[in-house]
Amino acid sequence: MKTLEELNLVDDFLVNSLTSHKIYGEQSARYILECILRRQIGKLTVVPQRFFCGENTETHGIRLDVYLDEENGEIFDIEPDQNDGKEEIVSLPRRVRFYHAKIDAGNLTAGDTYGSLRNVIVIFITTYDPFGLNRMVYTIKNGCIEVPELEYEDGAQTIFLYTRGREGNPPEELKQLLHYMEHSSIENASTESLKKLHRMVTAVKRDGEVGLAYMKSFEREERIRRQGEEEGRKAGLEEGIIKLSRKLGKEDTEILSLLQEELQIDEEQAKLILEKYQQ
């Protein structure tokens, strides 16, 4: 795991800490948005790591990295993403579809008309090419297949920004911002605006509260990793005991006793383990 000093703005912890910071939050979020959208943005309320829960324990919820609410305007969600696994990339459009659905559902209260739904722009900033065309900007909106020129305005828009894309003649300021987000050093702060952003990033990294939060997140990830390793070791031991016992022709009663002895568990737990490997 990187140290806090080593983090770049494309790391979700840092961009979340920056945009939610009590001093630098709104101005940093505004600069990033205005650079991406190339227009002015109104007063912003930043909701770091906004949660939209599932309807019940059986349904999926989401956690949004940087949720931005423009006063009397649009809703924005900024999602830095470095998870370049094949399955994750293929499912990205469906993931975005779900994000839009949850954001809309969370902002339409009882009695509201559908016409009152606010415009929502979900922005993914990725260090991988989500569609393989080497474009820096992919802007996605719903439309009509039969009549492409038909104006179909449902208020939903998604922008994928590939930090290393070259095709499509992206604006120079956007190229510089995305390069800085992936490599957040003073050497890559090539404009006055980026130098100002870098000063904010540096100040946030030196903030004691941010450092404490990062240390806690590091400890939490370490606990999860160790727990996963322990569970994996235990599962491997369970399977090994059962497979070896079967090879040696041992009866289930003998295997149960061996499981209890080796794993320090009671008979009921041993039976559950044995049943698991008989399925």
Regions found by a protein language model. Name each.
Residues 145-146, 153-167, 171-172, 176-183:
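Upstream accessory/linker segments immediately N-terminal to the RecA-like ATPase cores of bacterial MutS
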Residues 1-6, 13, 67, 76-81, ...:
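Short, charged alpha-helical interaction segments and adjacent helix-coil junctions
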